């Protein structure tokens, strides 16, 4: 089983990594192509492109300017430890064992607007480039066109390497839209995490994102390779609901969020 999750806007490049292990991203030639194009934009143009403040636009213009594919532990950090945010709070990779990192490296991938697809221990430099960014490029009108079927092809390779064909989608719609299903040789399993609010079970963004991270951790810690065992997920009050679920869309309900 291979899992995919979204990246995060919030980054942590200050704290010391809990593991010295690292790998290099596999698709940096594509990243370099995007960086060269982004370097042609002024901070104001970057702010407009990304719909962010002048401060964030200026920060990312500087990041693009200093970006180099020569990643070291001095200028980069492992992706799984660099990303922070709701999904990564649920994942809590800072408490992984060495064996957990090994399993995650084989079974977890992070989708990325700049890097395409990252393994947990892949080094990355800080950046912000949402997959939904409408950046015209040589391959089309936006990043979905830029990545084309490449991400699907790379996922196929990762699945083939582990002799499996199950892809567990724990990413947002914005990011999973970069996975072209027609090019993917896999059974896709989707998940929904709903919380009880005003008498109805609803997807509440903050809780759902955190739950995707908790599900990722559950799979890694339990070394799950049988999709049927995903139904055993019962972290922080969530329970599988057969009535609302379908074979490839697993729904988990929770009545009370932890205090």
Curated annotation (Swiss-Prot):
InterPro entries: YaaA. It comes from the Bacteria. GO terms for biological process: response to hydroperoxide. GO terms for cellular component: cytosol. Transmembrane segments: none annotated. It holds the Pfam family H2O2_YaaD. NCBIfam families: PRK02101.1-1, PRK02101.1-3. PANTHER family: PEROXIDE STRESS RESISTANCE PROTEIN YAAA (PTHR30283:SF4), PEROXIDE STRESS RESPONSE PROTEIN YAAA (PTHR30283). Belongs to the UPF0246 family. This is UPF0246 protein PFLU_0992.
